[in-house]
Structures are given as structure tokens and as C-alpha cells.
């Protein structure tokens, strides 16, 4: 029995030794693999970091180049806009000068024409006023002359009639009634003559 137990113990020890050996091999292999994996990971990380740095630098350079291009484009656009605006201002100023010159010339012509028209109208008005004044004076003179002549004729006629009546009365002094009638007729004739002269 003891041998059976010794055998079992021997086998158990042998199995344990095999197991420990196997475990040691597995552990060593695992350690090697872990170390190798760690090295690879570290290398990959370093490579990635280097690549990342390179990418970062490249991105930075590209961004700088894009910024410079954008700045150049903006400056060119600004210059072009400024040039266009200046050209527009120059054109507007030139157009304004031309328009101002044209309007000034037209205004001067209009002023001159208005002055000529006003002068002609003033001259015509003065001529018309002078003609009217002359006509009025001539009419007044003519009317006064006609009235004076008529008045003198009436007076002459009245005097002549009076003399004739007096002469007639002087011949027939004894007819007193006729004398009164003749005086009345002479007065009536003189009054009628004065009324006629006033109407003219």
C-alpha cells in the first residue's frame, strides 16, 4: 500500500512539475509577447505622434498659406474696389463739371434773352405811353381850339344879333313891347349858344 501511495505522490509531484514548467513556459511566452506588444504599441504611438506632429505642421503650413492667399485676395479686391470707386468719383466729377457748364451756359442765355425781352417790352411801353400822351395833348389842344372857335362864333353871332336888334330898336323906339320881346329872344339865344358850346 505504501508503494501505491508513493506512486501517487510521485505522479502528483511529476504532474505538478510539468504544470509548473508549462506555466513557466506560458508565463515566459506571455511576458515576451506582452513585452513585444508593448514595444510595438510604443513604437506605433511614437510613429503616430510623429505622424501627428507632421500632420499638425502640414496643417499649420496649409492654414498659413490659405490665410496669406485670402489676405492677398482681399487686398486685390480692396484695391480693385478702391480703383473702381475712384474712377466712378472722377467720372461723376467730370459729368458734374460738364453738366454745370452746360447749365451755366443755358442759364446765361436765358438771362440774356429775358433781359432783351424786358428791354424791348420797356421800350415798347415807353413808346406807347409817349404816343398816348401826345395823342391826349393833341386831342385836348384840338378840342380846346374847336370849343374856343365855337364860343367865339357864338359870341360874334350874339353880338351881331344884339347889334341888329338894337339897331332895329333904335329905329323904332316907340315900340316898347317889341323891344322887350327882342331882348328876351336875344337872352334865350345867348343861353342856348353857351349850352351848345359847353356840350362840345
Swiss-Prot record:
Source organism of the structure: Oryza sativa subsp. indica (Rice)
Chain intervals with Polar residues compositional bias: 145-156
Keyword Coiled coil recorded: yes
Ranges of biased composition (kind: Basic and acidic residues): 13-23, 30-42, 53-81, 88-97, 105-114, 172-183
Name the UniProt record assigns to this protein: Late embryogenesis abundant protein 19
Coiled-coil ranges from the UniProt annotation: 52-81
Induction or repression: In seedling roots and seedling leaves, induced by salt stress. In seedling roots induced by abscisic acid (ABA). Induced by cold stress.
Additional free-text comment from the UniProt record: Plants overexpressing LEA19 display enhanced drought resistance under field conditions.
A single GO BP: positive regulation of response to water deprivation
PANTHER family the record matches: DAUER UP-REGULATED-RELATED, RE19971P
Keyword Glycoprotein set for record: no
